[in-house]
Amino acid sequence: MMNQTVTEEAVRRLAEGTHHDPFQILGCHAVGKKWEVRVWLPTAESASVEGWHALTRVEGTSLFIASLTEKQKKALPLHFKVNWVEANGSEHTVVSPYTFLPQLGELDLHLYAEGRHWHVYDVLGAQVKEVDNISGVQFSVWAPAASRVSVVGDFNGWNGLRHPMRTNGQSGVWELFIPGMVSGDIYKFEIRNYQTDQLLVKTDPYAKAMEFRPQTGSIVYDSTFQWQDRDWLAARAHFDWQASPINIYEVHLGSWQRDHDGFFLNYKEIAQRLVEYVKWMGYTHIELLPISEHPLDESWGYQTTGYFSPTSRFGSPDDFRYFVNYCHENGIGVFLDWVPAHFPKDEFALARFDGTALYEHEDPRRGEHQDWGTYIFNYGRNEVRNFLIANALYWLKELHIDGLRVDAVASMLYLDYSRKDGDWLPNQYGGRENIEAIEFLKTLNAEVHAQCPGALMMAEESTSWPMVSRPTWMGGLGFSMKWNMGWMNDTLDFFQQDPIYRPYHHNQLTFSQMYAYSENFILPLSHDEVVHMKHALVSKMPGDTWQKMANMRLLMGYQTLNPGKKLLFMGGEFAQWQEWSESRGLDWYLCEQPANRGVQMLVRDLNLLYQTSPALYCHDFDQEGFEWIDCHDYEQSVLSFVRISEKESLICVFNFTPVPRYDYRIGLPETGIYEEVLNSDSELYGGGNVGNSGQLTTEDQRWMNRPCSTTLVLPPLAVVVLRKKS
């Protein structure tokens, strides 16, 4: 027979896992002049309170009750312990979770509902903390369409009836403080949808760590890492990045190097090896393909399921902190690819999180990306915007990342992106612009720039959307820089042409100067160009092996000497022949081959020239740093221009044919002696050593609207760089 102090309906809802607030039943409650202790123990045979007062099972249920006098109640600790024995004889003692007050404050919930709680990662998820001098973990999750949410894990046998959570008013946020849980415990949320009764088991969207694939559990994580990069962060805040060299080495951590058995290296091991190499090569920054947790290696990290979790493939979150800290201690910045455009449909993660379209847009015409088979975030929902912006700030503030490269921005800006007529919904004005995504990006960039001094935001945006890298107060999107996809596509298309046909494609080299200063551009040669049967960079080149290598050296020079910051994907610097694969390390043995070693040494010298030549970086984003000498010699496929700074000028001359050009006359800005500071045909780089004996003297002959000129030897498929001797 049911105890009269607890209704059958309440117990039924507990048993079915549909009660929205188990605190109304469980814990210690006044009943007239007495008190009742109530606990819910689905696997217990017997139980007691504090080891001295037996609990009695309510017949036919998992509810145990003890009736206490006022005196006994006073002797009972506020947060009492429950002892119980299971059928197999195992004994357990825990502090009841149902004696604690709500831990989430009204301000937290208010800011979150408004989409302005930028440190919500310190509130939601799993927070290791002490409450009333009792240590445990505070769990909180947003699931407004749930009739019940429970914390499940090894600690309770993954039984969703053991630790049901309480709701917080109309916020949709559920919470529960569980005493005794510690960093390292594995957990998930079990969610019952209130309309369909569908039962879901989900990873924590705010989890700071996750299990190694194929396992998908969230891990309670409390960092103990001690940062040592204060000087770096202080200097970064005042860094004049627009007038400084930024040379980015794009890296996929799982395939840069592996151990002898083909397994992943740890973040700490990678840090030691990668930083040494990057410093030797002369790069200023590393850009990591996404390392937020993802289940599928083949996605390269671009289908994220754990937005706040550095992937466990390479170690713990503190191991990743070590990686970033080690880079900073060695003067290397760290950028990260970040994916707020879409997320995968894996059932254990964000997709249909509470049984409804919670993080994604409900209408598939806005909520599904047809090409990628993924969901698109609902940027019009406050809590979703908050999740993403807080995530960006988490990587920048808590993990000390120096900047984010935002993936697939074009797919966010346009409602009809990669959609046929009838497959998309216009905005409220009838247009194709995604107004909610635009406002999200502006808010994101404004908050990053305000809260993270010196952090950079970079857009992979493949259309001609205006003012991507202009401040929000000017009407721009607020990014620091934008990838110049047009330059990359035109350049690679040109280089793939047989030199016989290059005169007919000459405009592909010159056209980018028509828009080069409309944005703050990065010139990328990225991972996307060396996969999916596109071939490795050197394999794209026409001709025999010698010509392919010469073209590769020419491409490296062309990228370095053009205005714009630089990015090169790993393996390109030593002309790896194979397409990149995430399943193996790079072909480092090629660095022992003379031709590949030559390309590597050229890239190293180009990087050194770039870092030590203000003309190559001071005016990347304005026309003062660039002048054509001759952009019209399409018949011979020769280009020449000047890179300019207040301190120096560099003359850059390119020969895009395998025919050496002797006595080739170019105009020069000043009379004097010019030294040949770089020649990509040098035998040091695997070339034929055709050149100009180290220096040239001008003649008083006007040429190309210049006051003087000189004749030089242009090596085949090569670039020559000249600097006037002081």
UniProtKB/Swiss-Prot annotation:
Give the residues annotated as coiled coil: none
Which SMART domains does the UniProt entry name for this protein?
Aamy
Gene Ontology molecular function, alphabetical: 1,4-alpha-glucan branching enzyme activity; cation binding; hydrolase activity, hydrolyzing O-glycosyl compounds
The record's annotation in Pfam families points to: Alpha-amylase, Alpha-amylase_C, CBM_48, GlgB_N
Listed GO cellular component terms? Answer: cytosol
Q: Provide the GO biological process annotations.
A: glycogen biosynthetic process
Top-rank taxon of the source lineage equals Bacteria
Q: Cite the active-site annotation.
A: D407 (nucleophile), E460 (proton donor)
Q: What is its EC number?
A: 2.4.1.18
Q: Which reaction does it catalyse?
A: Transfers a segment of a (1->4)-alpha-D-glucan chain to a primary hydroxy group in a similar glucan chain
Q: Quick one: which pathway?
A: Glycan biosynthesis; glycogen biosynthesis
Judged by the first EC level, this protein's enzyme class is transferase
Keywords assigned by UniProt, alphabetized:
Carbohydrate metabolism, Glycogen biosynthesis, Glycogen metabolism, Glycosyltransferase, Transferase
Family in the record: Belongs to the glycosyl hydrolase 13 family. GlgB subfamily.
How the protein assembles, per its UniProt entry? Monomer.
- Function per UniProt: Catalyzes the formation of the alpha-1,6-glucosidic linkages in glycogen by scission of a 1,4-alpha-linked oligosaccharide from growing alpha-1,4-glucan chains and the subsequent attachment of the oligosaccharide to the alpha-1,6 position.
What protein does this entry describe? Answer: 1,4-alpha-glucan branching enzyme GlgB
Task: Give the species this sequence originates from.
Answer: Hydrogenovibrio crunogenus (strain DSM 25203 / XCL-2)
Task: State the organism's lineage.
Answer: Bacteria, Pseudomonadati, Pseudomonadota, Gammaproteobacteria, Thiotrichales
